[in-house]
Design a protein with these regions (language model features):
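An anion/pyrophosphate-binding glycine-rich loop and adjacent beta-alpha core
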Residues: 200, 206-308, 312, 374, ...
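Residue-level detector of alpha-helix initiation sites
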Residues: 11-12, 35, 180-181
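N-terminal Rossmann-like FAD-binding beta1-loop-alpha1 element of flavoenzymes
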Residues: 4-30
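Conserved N-terminal glycine-rich FAD pyrophosphate-binding loop of Rossmann-like flavoproteins
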Residues: 34-66, 70, 231
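A glycine-rich dinucleotide-binding beta-alpha-beta segment and adjacent secondary-structure elements
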Residues: 138-139, 144-153, 159, 297-349
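Glycine- and aromatic-enriched mobile tails/lids
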Residues: 1-3, 20, 24, 35-37, ...
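Glycine-rich loop(s) and the adjacent beta-strand/alpha-helix scaffold that form part
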Residues: 172-225, 361-374
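Conserved redox-cofactor binding core of oxidoreductases
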Residues: 38, 88-165, 169-172, 176-177, ...
Length: 418
């Protein structure tokens, strides 16, 4: 098990961690309950990443992040992200991710505007990871517990998609399992995102911070029969938000720039639209949008849906979107449990009470790169240790653990690399 890093979660944070860990020379195994890459929330993202640039300084980014988070952010984490973001963005470009920089944001560009940018991002990154020797993936694997020995993480236990119990040992484990949005009846997350990483962390004795801060996205389709798809910015100038009686909601509340409200005031904008929805409904009216706009992102995505958007308004409402709270970790990504690292949405500190638009993916690439690098250093520096076996201290006892399938047998049978 020496030199091995296990990554729980195959979204942007997990795959970024895999690239970093492999670059340092570690053997990497990625496990996920769903498909690698495209089965994660990262694939549903608009592909926007906030961060410092030549025209948007680090202090500007820090100010906007703290302001959006109502000052409840971990200031050290915000400064760390500002410092590390530019290099993390360069890594994405180096592996073939098409990105456009404009002011405070980098945006992933899909060659086909009807394809969600997150899909393009995760396809390209998954393809890159798939080509790395020493990186393996186990999709359809459900982790049920973290193994511990002598006060440090030493592996995982769980079940394969065929229901086989499996114990895998490693001197470094990275939690990159995402948030818990699918716990809400109305959400825009993948259905599997139900807080498994938080549960594993809590069972291992880690403190979860600020879990009361849940971000709702303001504009999500609410038409019966349609998926709960985000209405991605930029918001078309000719589009209108109306109430049940046809009144202009934006004018009613003095919102001159809806895109600014989506990015910087998402919490208050969602609360406002929720109240309007309770009073009779909120509708997105795209009938005045020019035909040419339907050939460009983001409206080109709507062409795939069976709804007459050009003929009548569509119901929209806020939906659970992102968890601001999570696990505390050092700058290296290591948690209070030695050998256990965390990255992505499960990590506490950057967002405060409300996330700045574009900071989700930024958090993934920055914290993923750091966790992967330092987890690899930890794994490579550790001498061979006795098996976790019966001496391990699992956070929760799993039935059938004694009949665990050997890791090497499973690895030889893998047909899908991340």
């Amino acid at each position: 098990m020496a030199g091995r890093v296990i990554i729980i979660g195959a979204g942007l944070a997990g795959l970024t961690a895999a690239v970093a860990a492999r670059t340092e020379g570690a053997e990497v195994l990625i496990v996920d309950r769903g498909p690698i890459g495209l089965g994660t929330n990262s694939a549903l993202a608009n592909g926007v990443m906030s961060g410092p640039s030549d025209r948007y300084g680090a202090e500007d980014y820090i100010r906007d992040t703290l302001r959006a988070g109502c000052g409840l952010n971990c200031a050290a984490r915000v400064r760390l992200t500002a410092r590390e973001a530019p290099s993390a963005f360069r890594v994405l470009r180096s592996v073939g991710i098409p990105m456009r920089e404009r002011g405070a944001q980098r945006t992933v560009v899909s060659p086909d505007p009807s394809v969600i940018p997150g899909v393009t991002l995760m396809r390209r990154l998954s393809d890159h990871v798939r080509g790395l020797d020493g990186v393996h993936a186990l999709p359809g694997f459900c982790v049920t517990e973290l193994l511990r020995r002598d006060g440090r993480a030493c592996g995982i236990r769980g079940f394969t998609r065929r229901g086989e119990p499996l114990q895998i040992e490693a001197p470094a484990v990275i939690l990159a399992a995402g948030g818990a949005g699918a716990l809400w009846r109305r959400h825009d997350n993948q259905r599997r995102i139900m807080g498994q990483g938080y549960a594993l962390a809590a069972q291992a004795g880690l403190e979860l911070l600020d879990m009361e801060f849940v971000q709702f996205y303001p504009l999500v389709l609410a038409e019966p029969g349609l998926p709960a798809l985000i209405v991605y910015p930029p918001f078309a100038r000719e589009a209108r938000l109306t109430g049940a009686s046809g009144e202009d909601i934006l004018a009613k509340h003095g919102l001159a720039d809806v895109n600014d409200a989506i990015v910087k005031k998402r919490d208050r904008f969602s609360a406002l639209l929720f109240e309007e929805a309770q009073a009779g409904g909120v509708f997105l009216d795209l009938r005045g949008v020019p035909a040419a706009a339907w050939d460009a992102h983001p409206l080109a995505i709507f062409r795939r849906l069976r709804f007459p958007f050009r003929e009548r308004p569509a119901a929209v409402a806020p939906a659970a979107h992102f968890m601001m709270g999570g696990v505390r970790a050092a700058e290296t990504g290591e948690t209070d449990l030695a050998g256990l690292f965390a990255c992505g949405e499960i990590l506490w500190g950057l967002q405060g009470a409300n996330r700045l638009g574009g900071n989700a993916l930024t958090e993934c690439v920055v914290s993923g790169a750091l966790a992967g690098r330092f987890a690899a250093e930890r794994a490579l520096a550790m001498p061979p240790a006795p098996s976790c076996g019966q001496k391990a201290q699992p956070a929760a006892r799993a039935e059938g653990a004694g009949t665990a399938v050997q890791y090497r047998e499973i690895l030889r049978g893998l047909r899908e690399a991340a």
